[in-house]
């Protein structure tokens, strides 16, 4: 089993000789992937899954083909199971959340709700 984690940049202020240095942003705008130990359920083998080229990934959904959906700076990005970007829903705003429905993918941005008529289906978490 594999677990995905989206990490937001952490802003740090460092004091050096009484002066506040510029903020450092750690880590990158990326999603991490882990292996999950089937016995202990602990996460191991952390590695970068995918990078966002616009904004910070926020929210995560998976479809039945293993594709990963995440809200980013310009809309929703879609990566295949290997972490290659395969599509974007351009909304010209930051996506806050995505939800698979029987009618498609419901996308919520900062002010509006969109329904994308797509063939992909969300995974059934009750099966896990």
Predicted regions and their residues:
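Beta-rich, blade/repeat-based domains predominating
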Residues: 1-23, 51-73, 92-104, 108
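A detector of repeated loop/turn-to-beta-strand junctions in beta-rich toroidal repeat architectures
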Residues: 28-30, 43
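Short glycine/proline-enriched turn or capping motifs at secondary-structure junctions
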Residues: 101, 105-123
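Short loop/turn segments immediately following the C-termini of beta-strands
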Residues: 16, 24-27, 36, 73, ...
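Blade-edge beta-strand/turn elements of extracellular beta-propeller
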Residues: 1-4, 35-53, 78-91
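WD40 beta-propeller blade core
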Residues: 32, 77-78, 114
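Short loop/turn segments immediately following beta-strands, especially the blade-tip
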Residues: 34-41, 117-125
